[in-house]
Regions:
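Conserved RNA-binding domains used in RNP assembly and mRNA/RNA metabolism
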Residues: 2-80
Length: 80
């Protein structure tokens, strides 16, 4: 089976600074923008799953499971 290589741009939860902050300071923090690359092995309305590796026996290694709400964009990477 053929799998698409994809770049996923997504937002992650972050804790930018340890320690106490005022409510005003806390409201200024934002989710961390991230990018991940992998083989698209599954997607549905709730989630997208990519794998770092796929073996000849179609076993996977290095999975990342993304909730759809965290994903900003998915781009197919063309390769030869």
């Amino acid at each position: 089976m053929e799998y698409n290589l994809v770049l996923i741009e997504w937002k992650d939860i972050c804790d930018p600074h340890a320690g106490w902050k005022s409510l005003e300071e806390s409201a200024e923090f934002n989710p961390m923008p991230c990018k991940s690359v992998g083989w698209l092995i599954f997607e549905n309305p709730e989630k997208v799953i990519i794998a770092q590796d796929i073996s000849g026996d179609e076993e996977t290694n290095g999975l990342s499971v993304f909730p759809r709400g965290c994903i900003k964009d998915i781009k197919r990477i063309k390769y030869e």
